[in-house]
């Protein structure tokens, strides 16, 4: 399964004409804080792909991409953008079912057709960012300008706020 997923991620990057490179990652170090420390990646160059799941109505999922140094406004912005009454972070099993990916590897590339992607505009201010590679053993270094070219994607100013140190 992971080879199929890896191929789908690469195909999505190629289809979007992305400027990117992939890097191997120890699966035990795939979570953002551990990854950044182990591989000397600045946290503000790392972007987290977060799946939100609606509770009312049930069954609506969306992917949100925010810098690791920021916090997604789930209850206000997430709910409004998804046009649902109640929303929460998708637990690992729901994330896997909705995306085919496991936490620590979720990526905007190769996501299921029709799954909306909301990208915090702050992500776009960087020359490159690191995102998941679809699996916990691969990351993708990518020029964020590609996000504006992906289908079902909206760039959202102020989607996330800076985390106080």
What is each stretch, according to the model?
Residues 1-165:
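Extended, low-hydrophobicity, polar/charged segments
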């Amino acid at each position: 399964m992971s080879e199929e997923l890896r191929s789908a991620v690469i195909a999505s990057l190629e289809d979007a004409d992305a400027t990117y490179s992939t890097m191997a990652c120890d699966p035990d170090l795939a979570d953002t804080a551990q990854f950044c420390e182990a591989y000397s990646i600045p946290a503000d160059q790392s972007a987290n792909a977060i799946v939100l799941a609606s509770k009312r109505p049930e069954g609506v999922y969306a992917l949100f991409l925010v810098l690791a140094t920021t916090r997604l406004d789930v209850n206000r912005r997430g709910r409004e953008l998804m046009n649902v009454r109640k929303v929460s972070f998708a637990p690992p099993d729901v994330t896997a079912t909705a995306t085919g990916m496991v936490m620590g590897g979720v990526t905007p590339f190769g996501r299921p057709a029709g799954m909306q992607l909301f990208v915090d505009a702050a992500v776009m201010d960087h020359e490159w960012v690191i995102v998941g590679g679809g699996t916990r053993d691969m990351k993708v270094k990518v020029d964020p300008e590609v996000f504006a070219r992906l289908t079902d994607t909206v760039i959202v100013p102020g989607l996330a706020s800076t985390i106080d140190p």
